[in-house]
Amino acid sequence: PSFSMYGEYATLSDSVAAPYPLTEEGYVDPEVVIEFCERERPALLIVCNPNNPTGNYNPLSAMEKIVANVECPVIMDEAYMEFADGKEVPPTDMRPLNKLWLVAGSTLSLVGKYSNLMVFRTFSKAYGLAGLRCGYAVGAAGVMRLLGKALLPYHVNAYTLMVAKTLYENKDLYKEQIKLVRSERDKMAAYLAKLGFKVWPTATNFVTFCAQDELTKSLALAYERKYRDCSLTPQVASGKMMFKYLMENSILVRDYSGHAKLTGCLRVTIGTPEENLTILQKL
């Protein structure tokens, strides 16, 4: 599974989205993706890293292997990359990208090496500007010219650009906040695992998890008794039970319990330490 809007955007552009499989743990297997591209001959390949909704981070070496061995343009969607553990790059550092140590092995360091690579980043996640809809792409001149032909004129308004510029110039102010999110994320993942949940490896600002074994059975039974619904599988019912219970307690999480590849899963976004504690107490 990956970001659901890829398919929507493909449909809007009269294209067909062809998904490639991830590993059972949610990682990208370079060999599988390369073989997929050789077989399907896609016009464009998209890799979400870290992946949404599982949270997995794939190492730079794996991403480079894909870019180097496929013929089509590649979009590396790094919307959540700031949450991956790694060193930051000062905004005043103007050295070439391939000379920088970028956060958690971002593929930005490969832009000068591969002409088919585009790296997409956003201000929506780590910097909280989702409502302003400001993202950016970095790539070789040739592939960026192709992207430019598809963009509408005036696609980013002046106010959004002004806010994004100011934020980027002061992004050091966000470092402690991002560190806190990472710390709270790791605490939540560890505690959920201690409670008996299966937790997906995550390098984002969210944690995806589901019940397993006896916990699945007990939650499914509770769902059937409370809602008098025996139509769901135990795994789906366990996820629905948790989702409904949290909703009743004014806690909104993302419900993936009916998803074919994330059966029974919920995704919770990291909040303040107090909010995170409340969620864990309810669970």
What is each residue range found by the language model?
Residues 131, 203-204, 260-264:
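Short acidic/glycine-enriched loop/turn segments that link adjacent beta-strands
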Residues 1-47:
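PLP-dependent aminotransferase-like
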Residues 181-182, 186, 192-249, 266, ...:
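Conserved PLP-binding catalytic core of the aspartate aminotransferase-like
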Residues 27-40, 53-74, 78-124, 142:
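Active-site pre-lysine segment of PLP-dependent enzymes
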Residues 44-48, 75, 136-138:
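Structural motif
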Residues 5, 116-193, 197-200:
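PLP-dependent aminotransferase class I/II
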